[in-house]
Structure formats: structure tokens, C-alpha cells
């Protein structure tokens, strides 16, 4: 009976992908590591059945586009668009209030210096 239901619904096979990795102390640990992958698979499966395959492909393309946006080298990219698509903007973690660059003790690097270094315009020889 289960095989008939599975064939009719075309459910994705959900198996523990990290179970073969050595060094995990408990099976629950491997399940927790695979939770995000399994959740994405199920969400894509449901979206494919409701809206069609094009919707899953469209979301993957949007994720790729939003993950490419970068700021200048001295500023950290917040990736707001990517966080919104992935649903991470609804979570409130320690990093949201503990990793504020304005309260950091380390000074921000100079924009011109970091761009010259990135473009390879800095010379290792000193002028003096």
C-alpha cells in the first residue's frame, strides 16, 4: 500500500545524507544537520505540485541573482533581498544585535586602500 501511495504522489526520497559522515556522535546530530536540506526539498516539492516546475526554477534563479549583490569592500553586504526570499528576515538571532559594526572596536578599513589592494594597484616597494 505504501509503495502505491508513494508512486501516485511522486514524493521525494528523504534520507539522511550526513549519516555516512564519520565523527558524528549521535544520529540526532546528523538529522539536525540535514533538516535544512530536507525542508527545502519538501518546500520545492509542494511548490512544484501546486504552481508547476517553472516556479521552483524561478525561485532558484532569484536566489542566485540576490546572492550576487555586493557593496563596496569596506562595508558588509546585508543581503536583505536574499534573506527575504529565504525567510531569514523573520528570525531574530544573536548576530542581529551583537554584531553591529557601529559598536565594534575595530576601525573600518579605508575605502581607497582596500580598492587599490583588490585591484592590485598597491606596490610592495616603498617610495622612500
Curated annotation (Swiss-Prot):
Record key words, sorted:
Chaperone, Cytoplasm, Nucleus
> Which GO cellular component terms, listed alphabetically, does the Swiss-Prot or TrEMBL entry include?
cytoplasm; cytosol; nucleus
The species this protein belongs to is Dictyostelium discoideum
Task: Return the Pfam families for the record.
Answer: UMP1
In the record, the note on similarity to other proteins reads:
Belongs to the POMP/UMP1 family.
Provide the primary localization.
Answer: cytoplasm
Q: What does this protein do?
A: May function as molecular chaperone essential for the assembly of standard proteasomes and immunoproteasomes. Degraded after completion of proteasome maturation.
Q: Does Cytoplasm appear among the keywords?
A: yes
Question: Looking at the keywords, is Coiled coil present?
Answer: no
Q: Where in the cell is it found?
A: Cytoplasm, Cytosol; Nucleus
| GO biological process, alphabetically ordered | proteasome assembly
Q: What is the protein's quaternary organization?
A: Constituent of preproteasomes, but not of mature 20S proteasomes.
Output this protein's name: Proteasome maturation protein homolog
